[in-house]
Amino acid sequence: MAAPRGRAAPWTTALLLLLTSQILSPGSCADEEEVPEEWVLLHVVQGQIGAGNYSYLRLNHEGKIVLRMRSLKGDADLYVSASSLHPSFDDYELQSATCGPDAVSIPAHFRRPVGIGVYGHPSHLESEFEMKVYYDGTVEQHPFGEAAYPADGADAGQKHARAPEDASQEEESVLWTILISVLKLVLEILF
């Protein structure tokens, strides 16, 4: 049933009020993106890239890094690799290829330097992008309750001292391995 002329349908009025409130709300600015307070902004990179071309960047920062990129003009896509300094859409470990904002979280265990490729999508002659590089200082919890990052600030590669029980179990394991090897040898000789 159509609404009488001169009077808008109730849902149209509600929709207009909702859109107006979204536009006028202070936190709706597209330029301001919310980030957790544990993140530290390291760099802001702006650039231009032609259609079908790559622009390459190198990341040397250690730790968990978050890349947030938005296309100011056109459509730029993001490719990341720990094994190649020139990642592409054929050779990458992480990627974000959306028509909107792109984001990639680079784990702390990725070997540095990390290669970053920004690809200009061929649907636009030229793309402009802005990439924000954040250090993610959040501490992830280990599934068994231990922190993923050492709490005392020790080097992540530092090994913890072994308990005496671990040493005796390791010795016992070596002895069993030797015993089984000798038994296999004896069985091969006999049969």
From Swiss-Prot:
- Any one GO cellular component localisation term in the record: extracellular region
Q: Which GO terms describe its biological process?
A: apoptotic process
* Main localization (coarse): secreted
What positions does the record give for glycosylation?
A: N53
Keywords, sorted A to Z: Apoptosis, Glycoprotein, Secreted, Signal
Residue pairs linked by disulfide bridges in the UniProt entry = none
A Pfam family (short name) is UPF0669
The protein's location, in the record's own words, is: Secreted
Signal sequence residues = 1-30
Protein family per UniProt: Belongs to the UPF0669 family.
Q: Which PANTHER family match?
A: UPF0669 PROTEIN C6ORF120
Functional note: May be involved in induction of apoptosis in CD4(+) T-cells, but not CD8(+) T-cells or hepatocytes.
Query: This protein is called what?
Result: UPF0669 protein C6orf120 homolog
